[in-house]
């Protein structure tokens, strides 16, 4: 309970005396009564906020039209009377609209007034007299004038006796409130100076006006004319006020106790410092470290759990021997706890135009990926935050997954931290080691938070498709908590042993393929695919990004080395035939290093590198323009690997007419072997219908996929294998160069396959312009950018019979 003011007993005694029937003090002013006839019309002043009650004595200041004219007219009226009505307006504004005013208000007398005509300002002291009710509006004004009925009948002595239980209940409740809050005492003193508690009507109005009740509740009291009903309503409001005051008192006491304890500790520490200073005692290492930890805490917004844990550890640190091993463990633990940016967040810069400029500056091509990232940022702008989504960038090596993550961090103004989970086999790398182990440390995510010094960085997890598992745990399972927006707000690192909120962190993961990512982990991510680049895009990337980067890296400038577009195109097609641009950058770097030697040998500048000069800089091309394999039983298929799209030649031959075996070579996986057997069975059943000779598929059949050192798997070569076998059965080569992809069933249906975009890019890279694709993949093909699809003739098929007709007629 808060301390009562020294004059509180005087007020409480006055209340008790009134309860016993004592009259007010001799200097109390009796209620005002106007003896002459009451006016039937009153000037109305609309009052915003709380209603004005009879018995109230309040200063009012009015300024400007129409308030000034209203009060001036009231000052000129008989008895200097006017009426105050509360307003219906939701914002509590004073409105000069009769329809916006309540019907019952208070007659007010002007006791004193000070008029400033130049400023149109009046300061007056107003006294509430009695209630009135509007019968009709004479003038809508302003000022508003209304015909009124006065309610000013005094309460009889008989009524006073009947109301005594109600008045005592009100007085007792008021007395309780005074014990908890002394601010009400001044209002009670002012009331006792003019009235006494033996007037139940005045008591009810006074008590209602001093509560913090709503405008509607107070207006209801004002409109209640029977005094007994009015006292009942006032008692209800007073009981509510008592509960509010008790709660406020409790909260204030708790706050004061907390502040007092904090101040006490502060003063004791300051006194200890002064004593040590006077005695010439310098701080030991332990005291200096504890002070340093406490200085860090002043800048942080700790959770209750963290604050309690840190205080416990600091108290423990203060009593441990500095030479003990436990002291070192505890010191390191407190150092980590106080180094984390509790409650420190950077401000997101969610400017879509700026983000688009940064993405376009850092990356050529990838338009669909940029649009998806901009959509993600736009949603974050509308929501006010961009946490809660986990982005997974999937694509071949070298297409710019990591650099896109950096660009996103720059675009939104967040700190960037990257680490690779490829090959990670220990769960403790994610969730930390328990402090009982020697050399224990927090996991990667806590380290990232400490390194970036903010609680909302952008963290990139590279190579999530290559995460491992061992007897030490499964890191992929540990990632489930981190990458789940519903759980990561209470992430618990084993070392920290205190929950830290990771929900504001923006996570971006990268992978080369989805097949090896655990399904529960993949379900938490939003996949954005990055396909490989076509030659024209690579030339632009090399010109705008890779070449300037390698010039700077090797100490050159553009006045010393010039590389033609023809040379860049030849590098791409002859030396760096890949989905990404990493090997392309390596080749440009090799040229730059050789040019650096020539510059120092004082060669004539600038040194120009054309298409015909590449042999002297890079040696013979790694890839030659090979003639496509042609002949009976040979078909080109389309494949999709972790490195991007690729073309795949399939060869078939009848090795003998004896026996009945299908030999498969070329390091094929189980799924591809099954697909080959299905295609072979389908052809054996339908070869005559498709124009082939069944005897050509009897005996021993050998099916080979070249580049035997490269593992191959998947069902997408089904129709390619079937076509190679049909070519063998018809003894007819393919009449033109085309490529195909699609899974085949025993009934000859052609099913959907994945990686359509990557396969189309692979076909363009080797010059194939006619494709056969499953009808079920039409939507995937339509999503391939227009500049990649340009020049292609594509056939969509549902049945293998359509494939045979397209190929052989």
UniProtKB/Swiss-Prot annotation:
InterPro entries: AAA+_ATPase (IPR003593), ATPase_AAA_core (IPR003959), Lon_bac (IPR027543), Lon_bac/euk-typ (IPR004815), Lon_lid (IPR054594), Lon_proteolytic (IPR008269), Lon_Prtase (IPR027065), Lon_prtase_N (IPR003111). Residues 42-242 form the Lon N-terminal domain. It is found in: Cytoplasm. Residues 629-809 form the Lon proteolytic domain. GO terms for biological process: cellular response to heat; protein quality control for misfolded or incompletely synthesized proteins. One of its GO terms (molecular function) is serine-type endopeptidase activity. It comes from the Bacteria. ATP binds at residues 395-402. Keywords: ATP-binding, Cytoplasm, Hydrolase, Nucleotide-binding, Protease, Serine protease, Stress response. The keyword Hydrolase applies. The keyword Membrane does not apply. GO terms for cellular component: cytoplasm. Induction: By heat shock. Its EC number is 3.4.21.53. Pfam families: AAA (PF00004), Lon_C (PF05362), Lon_lid (PF22667), LON_substr_bdg (PF02190). The active site is at residues 716, 759. SMART domains: AAA, LON. It catalyses: Hydrolysis of proteins in presence of ATP. ATP-dependent serine protease that mediates the selective degradation of mutant and abnormal proteins as well as certain short-lived regulatory proteins. Required for cellular homeostasis and for survival from DNA damage and developmental changes induced by stress. Degrades polypeptides processively to yield small peptide fragments that are 5 to 10 amino acids long. Binds to DNA in a double-stranded, site-specific manner. HAMAP family: lon_bact. Homohexamer. Organized in a ring with a central cavity. Belongs to the peptidase S16 family. This is Lon protease. It comes from Magnetococcus marinus (strain ATCC BAA-1437 / JCM 17883 / MC-1).
